């Protein structure tokens, strides 16, 4: 699905598709023995539905913290193989300078990769697509932008980067790749 080696900005629509995809990335990382740090909201029901089958030894590698409590030079960030920021910015308007600065600090402090998720904006030009908050700034910081959107059919989703498109199908609370 999402490249396992690059930091990404995941732009998603309303609903829980973005959360589900991030949790699947977390599950894959935990099962491979990685240390994961989730910054932001992590509802227990969503986490249980995806991570409920992961054994305690692997789950012990998952830490959850808040945006307000994280310090960019923390040991947790330095030892994390994967950092999920859910969400990295507010869900309306432009991302604030403090949010961009916090993301930059986290990118500079972690040796692992970062997935910064945010709700997309509707394209004001009437094109019908989604736009990403502060896209050019985040790409300058090294994040690749991926858009997760629904297809017309109920179970299908499209995960799209500048050079790849992956068709996903949502079944039994998880995404599986249909075509790349």
Annotate each predicted stretch with a short phrase:
Residues 21-25, 72, 102:
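Well-ordered alpha-helical segments embedded in enzymatic catalytic cores
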Residues 34-98:
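Conserved inter-motif catalytic segment of the P-loop NTP-binding fold
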Residues 14-16, 64-65, 124:
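Short, flexible loop segments at the rims of nucleotide/cofactor-binding pockets, characterized by
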Residues 112-180:
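Phosphate-binding/switch region of NTP-binding enzymes
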Residues 77-141:
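P-loop NTPase motor core
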Residues 9-11, 37-39, 65, 115, ...:
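Hydrophobic/aromatic beta-strand patches that form the interior of the parallel beta-sheet core
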Residues 1-55:
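The Walker A/P-loop phosphate-binding site
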Residues 2-3, 28-31, 56-57, 75-78, ...:
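Conserved catalytic network of the ASCE P-loop NTPase/AAA+ motor domain
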């Amino acid at each position: 699905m999402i490249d396992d080696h690059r930091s990404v900005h995941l732009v998603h629509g309303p609903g829980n598709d973005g959360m589900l995809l991030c949790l699947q990335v977390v599950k894959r990382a935990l099962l491979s023995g990685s240390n994961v740090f989730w910054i932001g909201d992590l509802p227990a029901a969503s986490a249980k539905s995806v991570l409920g089958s992961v054994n305690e030894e692997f789950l012990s590698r998952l830490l959850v913290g808040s945006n307000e409590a994280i310090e960019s030079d923390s040991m947790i960030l330095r030892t994390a193989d994967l950092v999920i920021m859910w969400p990295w910015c507010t869900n309306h308007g432009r991302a604030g300078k403090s949010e961009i600065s916090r993301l930059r600090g986290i990118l500079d402090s972690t040796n692992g990769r970062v997935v910064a998720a945010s709700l997309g904006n509707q394209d004001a030009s009437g094109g019908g697509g989604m736009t990403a908050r502060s896209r050019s700034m985040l790409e300058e910081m090294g994040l690749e932008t991926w858009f997760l959107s629904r297809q017309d059919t109920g179970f299908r989703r499209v995960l799209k980067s500048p050079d790849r498109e992956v068709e996903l199908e949502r079944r039994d609370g998880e995404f599986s790749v249909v075509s790349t």
